[in-house]
Amino acid sequence: EYDDMYTEKRPKVYAFGL
């Protein structure tokens, strides 16, 4: 799950792989 790492630099949308 990238939610934890991506949400820090990118919006929640990117966390899912969009």
From Swiss-Prot:
Task: Mark the residues carrying the PTM Leucine amide.
Answer: 18
Q: Where is the signal peptide?
A: none
Chief place of localization: secreted
Source organism, top-level taxon: Eukaryota
Q: Name one GO cellular component term.
A: extracellular region
Instruction: Please provide the Gene Ontology terms (biological process) for this protein.
Output: neuropeptide signaling pathway
> Where found, per UniProt?
Secreted
Q: Which UniProt keywords apply?
A: Amidation, Neuropeptide, Secreted
Q: What does this protein do?
A: May act as a neurotransmitter or neuromodulator.
Membership in a protein family: Belongs to the allatostatin family.
Protein name as catalogued: Carcinustatin-13
Native source organism of the sequence: Carcinus maenas
